[in-house]
Structures are given as structure tokens and as C-alpha cells.
């Protein structure tokens, strides 16, 4: 689902063909570039993905355990739980890429990546993006429109909307799996598009445009909600000082969402523009293609890092999550420490009066 940046790596046969073609003009340049390219693919990327795989398993495993003990009392918590599920599924695709890039799997192992792993990776990445947009809308409604249509605030509406998101993403993804039905050979295995049927190639292109539109829509929603909440808080803080502090926390929360979104997803989608909306990558020379390839893989890695940054959203935005985390780790927040100290002092005073009465 989406452009197979994890798999279609500036097709190796084309890249090596260009290098061998130019080998008569440059004695050591192409070989050096090929070595650097191979080291980046077989060492750097597998190590990076292994790091975020381990980190994501630990962080999201902890998040699953904590959310398991939190009731679905608000739509916000339910959206967060959906993001945890999407992140975990996305994380489980990393080992397949690590094995393939490190060269441990057989040559036909890439067929599994093209047909299944890549589809799951992108499907869950865009599922997370959609739920980040829904969280921003939820924060906007809670702050700016707290007395709006009650149906939009109900947990039932949230569950129905979440199911619709998963169904739509599944409908977009399944044809990419079914229509990747070509017979893998050593000649076509380097390009996932060659493993698709003609209809599969068209469907893949259509889904790529849909995903790009989804990203742009969520980007506009995030920016719009952040600006609207900031302006509303700025106006209300002059009139209702007591309520402004609570609403300012909502503004800080959505600021975390915007920061994670811009850090993880914006660079990748800016880098994929030449691949999505034109054939600019085919018009570039060899060195420019390599630069674009490195940028593409680095920004894709940033997108994958979202599975490690989402737990930050849970901690800063979900009070129930942070309280449960502190409770299980025997760490007290500042407010809890103050309340505990006040309780101890009251009990000491009570004991003193009981003693003096005797």
C-alpha cells in the first residue's frame, strides 16, 4: 500500500547497469559508490530498523498493558488504543525488512515483502495518520465546541467511526495483496511492480494518490485545529482565567501531536513527491538518483520512528495513561506527592489532638 519505498530501491539491475556502463570513464568511482550503496542497504538500515523494532516492542508493549487496564470512557482514549494496535502491527513488519536487507533470506523472500509486509506497513502507517487527525478533531471539539452535537462525543459514535477507518484501509489494502500474484523469478524479484498484474499496478497507483490525499487532509486538519484552539484559548484566557489553564493543557497536547506528525510524516511525503506525481526520478542522472534514494530511505525511517514516538503522545495527552504508569512504577506525580504530604500532616494533627484529649 502506498509507494513501495521499502522494496523498490532504485532497481538494482538499472543501477548496476549504469555503473558498469560508466566504468570505462571512471576507474574507481562507480565501485566506491556501489560499496557505499550496499553498506547503507545491508548494514545501516537493518541496524536502524532493529533499534526501533526493539524500542517499539518495549514501549508499545507497555502501552498495551496500561491501556488494557483503562476503560473506554472517552473517545480520545479509544482513538489512542487504535493507534497502539496500528503501531504494533506496523512494528511486526520490521523483522522481515531487517532479514531481507541484511541478506539473510533467500532470493524469493522479497516476494513476501512485496505482497504482504509492505502492504501491512503502509496500511497501518496511514491508519495511524488518520487517527492522529481524529484526535485533533476530538481536541478541537472538546475545547472550542464543548456543547455541540452530543452524538459526536459519544463512545458509540467513536467506535463506529474507528471501525469504518479500519474497514476502509482494509478495502484499499487487500487488492494490493491479491493482485500481487506474479510468479517471482530472479529477474523480476527486484521490482515489486513486476510482480503485480496490470490491474494491480493501476490499483497500486490509485491507492498511492488516495494515501497522498489522506496525508494532505490530515495535515490541513492538524494545522487548522491547532490554530483554532490557540486562538480560542488566547481569547478566553482574558475572560476566564480559571478555565484557561485547563484548556491550555489541551493546546499543549495537540502541539505534541503536531510535532510528532511533522517530524515523522512530513519529510517522507515531501520526498516522495517526485515518485507520486511525476516521473522526475527517471529524468535525473545517476548521482541525483542516489541522493534521492538516500533521502527517500531516511525519511521512510523517520516515518517508521512514529511507532516509538506515539507513546510520548499517550504520556503527555492521556492523564489516565500517565497515572497508571506512575502507579505501576511506584512513581508519584508532583500533585500526588503534595496530596500525600497533606494527608500525612492531617493525620499527624489528628493523632496529636487524640493524644492531648487523653
From Swiss-Prot:
<keyword id="KW-0807">Transducer</keyword>
<feature type="transmembrane region" description="Helical; Name=5">
    <location>
        <begin position="209"/>
        <end position="229"/>
    </location>
</feature>
<dbReference type="InterPro" id="IPR017452">
    <property type="entry name" value="GPCR_Rhodpsn_7TM"/>
</dbReference>
<dbReference type="InterPro" id="IPR008109">
    <property type="entry name" value="P2Y13_rcpt"/>
</dbReference>
<feature type="transmembrane region" description="Helical; Name=2">
    <location>
        <begin position="76"/>
        <end position="96"/>
    </location>
</feature>
<keyword id="KW-0812">Transmembrane</keyword>
<feature type="transmembrane region" description="Helical; Name=6">
    <location>
        <begin position="257"/>
        <end position="277"/>
    </location>
</feature>
<feature type="topological domain" description="Extracellular">
    <location>
        <begin position="278"/>
        <end position="297"/>
    </location>
</feature>
<feature type="glycosylation site" description="N-linked (GlcNAc...) asparagine">
    <location>
        <position position="25"/>
    </location>
</feature>
<feature type="transmembrane region" description="Helical; Name=3">
    <location>
        <begin position="117"/>
        <end position="137"/>
    </location>
</feature>
<feature type="topological domain" description="Extracellular">
    <location>
        <begin position="181"/>
        <end position="208"/>
    </location>
</feature>
<feature type="topological domain" description="Cytoplasmic">
    <location>
        <begin position="69"/>
        <end position="75"/>
    </location>
</feature>
<keyword id="KW-1015">Disulfide bond</keyword>
<dbReference type="GO" id="GO:0045028">
    <property type="term" value="F:G protein-coupled purinergic nucleotide receptor activity"/>
</dbReference>
<feature type="topological domain" description="Cytoplasmic">
    <location>
        <begin position="319"/>
        <end position="358"/>
    </location>
</feature>
<dbReference type="InterPro" id="IPR000276">
    <property type="entry name" value="GPCR_Rhodpsn"/>
</dbReference>
<feature type="transmembrane region" description="Helical; Name=7">
    <location>
        <begin position="298"/>
        <end position="318"/>
    </location>
</feature>
<comment type="similarity">
    <text>Belongs to the G-protein coupled receptor 1 family.</text>
</comment>
<feature type="glycosylation site" description="N-linked (GlcNAc...) asparagine">
    <location>
        <position position="33"/>
    </location>
</feature>
<dbReference type="GO" id="GO:0007186">
    <property type="term" value="P:G protein-coupled receptor signaling pathway"/>
</dbReference>
<protein>
    <recommendedName>
        <fullName>G-protein coupled receptor 87</fullName>
    </recommendedName>
</protein>
<keyword id="KW-1133">Transmembrane helix</keyword>
<dbReference type="Pfam" id="PF00001">
    <property type="entry name" value="7tm_1"/>
</dbReference>
<keyword id="KW-0297">G-protein coupled receptor</keyword>
<comment type="function">
    <text>Receptor for lysophosphatidic acid (LPA). Necessary for p53/TP53-dependent survival in response to DNA damage. Promotes the Hippo-YAP signaling pathway and thereby modulates glycolysis and oxidative stress production by the regulation of hexokinase-2/HK2.</text>
</comment>
<feature type="transmembrane region" description="Helical; Name=4">
    <location>
        <begin position="160"/>
        <end position="180"/>
    </location>
</feature>
<keyword id="KW-1003">Cell membrane</keyword>
<feature type="topological domain" description="Extracellular">
    <location>
        <begin position="97"/>
        <end position="116"/>
    </location>
</feature>
<feature type="transmembrane region" description="Helical; Name=1">
    <location>
        <begin position="48"/>
        <end position="68"/>
    </location>
</feature>
<dbReference type="GO" id="GO:0005886">
    <property type="term" value="C:plasma membrane"/>
</dbReference>
<feature type="disulfide bond">
    <location>
        <begin position="114"/>
        <end position="192"/>
    </location>
</feature>
<keyword id="KW-0472">Membrane</keyword>
<keyword id="KW-0675">Receptor</keyword>
<feature type="topological domain" description="Extracellular">
    <location>
        <begin position="1"/>
        <end position="47"/>
    </location>
</feature>
<feature type="topological domain" description="Cytoplasmic">
    <location>
        <begin position="138"/>
        <end position="159"/>
    </location>
</feature>
<feature type="glycosylation site" description="N-linked (GlcNAc...) asparagine">
    <location>
        <position position="4"/>
    </location>
</feature>
<keyword id="KW-0325">Glycoprotein</keyword>
<feature type="topological domain" description="Cytoplasmic">
    <location>
        <begin position="230"/>
        <end position="256"/>
    </location>
</feature>
Amino acid at each position: 500500500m502506498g509507494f513501495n519505498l521499502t522494496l523498490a530501491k532504485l532497481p538494482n539491475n538499472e543501477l548496476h547497469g549504469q555503473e558498469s556502463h560508466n566504468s570505462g570513464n571512471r576507474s574507481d568511482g562507480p565501485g566506491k559508490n556501489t560499496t557505499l550503496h550496499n553498506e547503507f542497504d545491508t548494514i545501516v538500515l537493518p541496524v536502524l530498523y532493529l533499534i526501533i523494532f526493539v524500542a517499539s516492542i518495549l514501549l508499545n508493549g507497555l502501552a498495551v498493558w496500561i491501556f488494557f487496564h483503562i476503560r473506554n470512557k472517552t473517545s480520545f482514549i479509544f482513538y489512542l488504543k487504535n493507534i497502539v494496535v496500528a503501531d504494533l502491527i506496523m512494528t511486526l513488519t520490521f523483522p522481515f525488512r531487517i532479514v531481507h536487507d541484511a541478506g539473510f533470506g533467500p532470493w524469493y523472500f522479497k516476494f513476501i515483502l512485496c505482497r504482504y509486509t509492505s502492504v501491512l506497513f503502509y496500511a497501518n502507517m496511514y491508519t495511524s495518520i488518520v487517527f492522529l487527525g481524529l484526535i485533533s478533531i476530538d481536541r478541537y471539539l472538546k475545547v472550542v465546541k464543548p456543547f455541540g452535537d452530543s452524538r459526536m462525543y459519544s463512545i458509540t459514535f467513536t467506535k463506529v467511526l474507528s471501525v469504518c477507518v479500519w474497514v476502509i484501509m482494509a478495502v484499499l489494502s487487500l487488492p494490493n495483496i491479491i493482485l500481487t500474484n506474479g510468479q517471482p523469478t530472479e529477474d523480476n524479484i527486484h521490482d515489486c511492480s513486476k510482480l503485480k498484474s496490470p490491474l494491480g499496478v493501476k490499483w497500486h497507483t490509485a491507492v498511492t494518490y488516495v494515501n497522498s490525499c489522506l496525508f494532505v487532509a490530515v495535515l490541513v486538519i492538524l494545522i487548522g485545529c491547532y490554530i483554532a484552539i490557540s486562538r480560542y484559548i488566547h481569547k478566553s484566557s482574558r475572560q476566564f482565567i480559571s478555565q484557561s489553564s485547563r484548556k491550555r493543557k489541551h493546546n499543549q497536547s495537540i502541539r505534541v501531536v503536531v510535532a510528532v506528525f511533522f517530524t515523522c510524516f512530513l519529510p517522507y511525503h515531501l520526498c516522495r513527491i517526485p515518485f507520486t506525481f511525476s516521473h522526475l526520478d527517471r529524468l535525473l542522472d545517476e548521482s541525483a538518483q542516489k541522493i534521492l534514494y538516500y533521502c527517500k530511505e531516511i525519511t521512510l525511517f523517520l516515518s517508521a520512528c512514529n511507532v516509538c514516538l506515539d507513546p510520548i503522545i499517550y504520556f503527555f495527552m492521556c492523564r489516565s495513561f500517565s497515572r497508571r504508569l506512575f502507579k505501576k512504577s511506584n512513581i508519584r506525580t508532583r500533585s500526588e506527592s503534595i496530596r500525600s504530604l497533606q494527608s500525612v500532616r492531617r493525620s499527624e494533627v489528628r493523632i496529636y489532638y487524640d493524644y492531648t484529649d487523653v
